[in-house]
Design a protein with these regions (language model features):
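Charge-rich, well-structured scaffold segments of protease-associated domains
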Residues: 3-5, 9, 20, 67-217, ...
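A glycine- and charged-residue-rich anion-binding loop/surface
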Residues: 18, 37, 55, 214-215, ...
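Extreme N-terminal starter segment of soluble prokaryotic enzymes
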Residues: 3, 14-15
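Active/ligand-binding-proximal structured segments within catalytic/core domains
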Residues: 13, 20-72, 246, 256-268, ...
């Protein structure tokens, strides 16, 4: 097991966390910024994600994207980033003797990005192609439509990538303003995990992030209106399969029942022994893929279900899924099934933390979003303490038919018919 993460707050307010893994031969370096698509406005949809792209496009020290990439790849590492609703993360994974390179490159990118108008125009088309690619993937697009159905015309319901039109209108001044609002202490966490010491990490971060800005970190609007905003949304496409996504409001990030929901989700739709897999696929043969997942945000959460079914089986598949939701909210889970779900959830949690990258990502995100790092054994203890009465209680909180939203992408989709199915 790794040692307990160590945390230091630098004089400017930036937080540094190190998770030492002495057996590793590498280190992961992650910089978390508490800025995601929820901070955007109608005009700036996609700004957080577009800026993430632009951070890779050169600095005075490394004037091109190729030189930025070569700095890490030439050290034997990998470099990437992602944007979510409430955060953006830039990361690399390098051999342990190249830790300084990993930290210095990310600091250079985030502090000194050129953001040249010419490069912005070039990358604009790349981002628009990414948006088109998502639209061309029916399963991914059904997920985007589910967000619209649940949250409507507000940041939680918008695509993180924005639209082709909003991306087309973003300019250098928008990126500079966004950086001033969000990219600074105490809104930044640097998380390192692997074969190193906290003293070494804190010293390097203090050196290369010494000019850390101060972020304004404006508050984001809470989820407004009724959720779901629409019960059903669909898009007709001449394809062979109907891609079904269902979702309902779940629990926010700090809710004490989040551990119970993890167990409930395992019972419902995680793995080949889950209820949805057994009932929808194995017993009825309605789908090849079916499952559920939970996501959490500061003030809301989502329990989402996805399935790929034959067009003629959409109604039956949704009916069966709704019945399984009802059962979990009304009938206690048997002890054997509960024990297996707890073991599966605990095992999956432990297996997900096998690498320095996973440990560093968890520690950094925890510190940024929760203000603390939940000890691994505390999470395991809380998962193992979940009882059948907890599952049915949380099932009654979350698994409510009147709050289920449905999206379908496939042939002959009609929203009126979908609304009838889910009502």
């Amino acid at each position: 097991m790794p040692v307990t993460p160590e945390v230091t707050s630098l004089p400017g307010g930036l937080r540094v966390v190190t998770t030492q893994v002495a057996s590793a031969q590498s280190v992961s370096v992650s910089v978390f910024v508490g800025a995601g698509s929820r901070g955007e406005e109608e005009r700036t949809k996609g700004l957080a994600h577009f800026l993430e792209h632009m951070m890779f496009k050169g600095t005075p020290k490394r004037p091109s994207a190729v030189e930025v990439a070569e700095a890490i790849e030439g050290a034997g590492g990998v470099l990437n980033a992602y944007t979510a609703k409430e955060l953006t993360c830039y990361w690399n994974h390098v051999p342990d003797d190249r830790l300084e390179t990993g930290i210095e490159v990310l600091a250079d990118m985030l502090h000194n990005a050129l953001l040249s108008p010419e490069e912005i125009d070039r990358e604009r088309n790349v981002v628009q192609q990414e948006i088109k690619r998502t639209r061309d993937q029916p399963g991914a697009w059904a997920g985007e439509l589910l967000g619209q159905a649940m949250y409507g015309d507000q940041p939680m319901g918008w695509s993180t990538a924005g639209t082709e039109d909003t991306v087309a209108a973003l300019a250098q001044a928008d990126f500079q303003e966004w950086i001033g609002l969000w990219y600074g202490a105490p809104n930044v966490v640097v998380s390192v995990a692997g074969n190193t010491s906290h003293e070494t990490v804190a010293g390097l971060v203090g050196r290369y992030f010494s000019d850390e800005r101060t972020a304004q970190s404006p508050s984001v609007a809470s989820v407004g209106g009724s959720v779901p905003a629409r019960r059903a949304i669909g898009e007709a496409r001449p394809i062979a399969q109907a891609n079904v996504a269902m979702g309902m409001p779940a629990l926010p990030r700090r809710d004490p029942d989040r551990y119970v929901l993890m167990i409930l989700n395992s019972v419902l739709g995680r793995g080949m022994s889950s209820r949805l897999f057994k009932e929808v696929r194995e017993r009825r043969g309605l789908a090849y893929s079916v499952g559920s997942a939970v996501s959490r945000h500061s003030d809301t959460g989502i329990l989402a279900i996805s399935a790929g079914v034959s067009p003629e089986n959409v109604r039956e598949a949704v009916r069966v899924i709704l019945e399984e939701l009802d059962k979990l909210a009304q009938e206690p889970v048997g002890q054997d099934e509960l024990t297996k779900a707890r073991d599966y959830t605990v095992g999956g949690f432990r297996l997900s933390l096998e690498t320095p990258m996973a440990l560093g990502q968890r520690a950094g995100e925890n510190l940024l979003t929760l203000g603390e790092i939940e000890p691994i054994e505390d999470v395991v203890e809380k998962l193992r303490a979940v009882g059948a009465e907890d599952v049915i209680r949380v099932g009654q909180r979350v698994l409510r038919r009147e709050r289920v939203a449905l999206s379908v992408v496939g042939p002959d989709v009609e929203e009126e018919a979908l609304l009838e199915i889910v009502s």
